[in-house]
Amino acid sequence: MRSASTLAVCAATLLQIACSTPIHPFHARSHQSYPSTEQWPLPVVGKQLEHQVPDEDLQEILSQISRDNIESTIRKLASFGTRHTLSSQTDPVRGIGAARTWLTAKFQEAADESEGRMTVDWNSFIKYPGDNERIIFPVNITTVVATLKGSEDPDRYYLTGGHYDSRNSNPIDYQGDAPGAVDDASGVAVSLELARIFAHYKPKATIVFTAFAGEEQGLLGAQNLAQTYKNASVNLAAMINLDMVGNSKAEDGTTDPHNIRLFCQGTPLTENASTTTSRLSIGGDNDSPARNLGRFIYEVASNAWTEMTAGYTGVRFVQPNEDYTQQHQNVTVRNGKQYGDLTQWLDFEYNTRAAKVVASTMWSLANAPAAPTNVGVNTTMSDNFSQFKWDAPKGLSVQGYEILYRETIEPHWTNVIDLGNVTWYNLTSATIHKDNVIFGVRSVGKGGYKSPAVLPFPFGCARNC
């Protein structure tokens, strides 16, 4: 599991400013009238945003997600004893090599049902000792990659997956048991189950289902795959990482079976100083591509409950609570308490619900047009107009665009303005304008599928430029 200390939870904090007594800094002007608080919240422009309802194909996909299949995959992966990155790659029944062979065969079974749309490959490299204390001898690191080609926009990729390597208390113990049931057979099981189901469908954009290796040594497999895509100029629009999605119970026994955490990077790690300055100038530090992807997921997938250094947008799903007596622990009993990442800790119903959230996300992303590009808002006009412009995305045809907005205290988009198929818009509201709310612009495609929103960056020119 990747430490959450390097990531930010995809949510905003509500700040409430309160004083025990009124503050009147200008006593000489005490007769001056001030705006009534009844004017807040702001009047609505457009309409209230509603969560996306699954279409018939997505409903069918969700109905096919099998708890039994997910459980079977997790138990099988745990049965290899250890899947440590440094463990045997030749033993037919124990170690990461045996797990890789089995996973490859299972992904290939899915591909065989796809009528040629899905292919299965390995993304492999040799990692040498030197700059990583958890690599003590040269080792082959292989990610299993199942690629389902898009039917209309195959050059736009969306990727999801978990890591199939595991570890125990000692990060370089590659011989001792490390069943890795929750961390992260639970994530790999989701990736494999969705590959099995999606192979029978034709998403418009390409979807990649993966099982990464080398995660416990520092996200090595995921980083190499992302760099491979970058070197090949692949348009990887989003990466959805599944790292521990199988247990809702905390160490103190608290359960939270109907929530899942979503970690989203703030200001992109690869963003240059000039872009960051522009972002901060308009208060956009909470509207990075990853966080707007998180808002998209909240909109399209929340109903299912009832990779950064390469410059790609990525988020990570993880269960609501963690129990550190199970995670990265030797399989042992101490003082009558069982330790270790064992299958007995799994909540398979929870794992299945998590799979439905991911399925909703991937299907909705792959069937929507790409997000608009070069999205801007004119910040030079000192008036109540908010002038926007953007460019149409490549790939799938766009039926129209929407402006989303939310008050600055809101974590999620609350309202939407339907614009039609235009590439600029003047919002003339005296209250809903660039000084009062956060805006985003998104594409709308056939069937009402929508892209994640894009934060408009500042530009300056005469009106209607």
From Swiss-Prot:
GO CC annotation: extracellular region
EC numbers for this chain: 3.4.-.-
Location relative to the cell: Secreted
Cofactor(s) needed by this chain: Zn(2+)
Binding site residues for Zn(2+) 1: H163, D183, D243
An example Gene Ontology biological process: proteolysis
Residues annotated to bind Zn(2+) 2: D183, E216
Family indicated by similarity: Belongs to the peptidase M28 family. M28B subfamily.
Protein name: Probable zinc metalloprotease PTT_17836
Species of origin: Pyrenophora teres f. teres (strain 0-1) (Barley net blotch fungus)
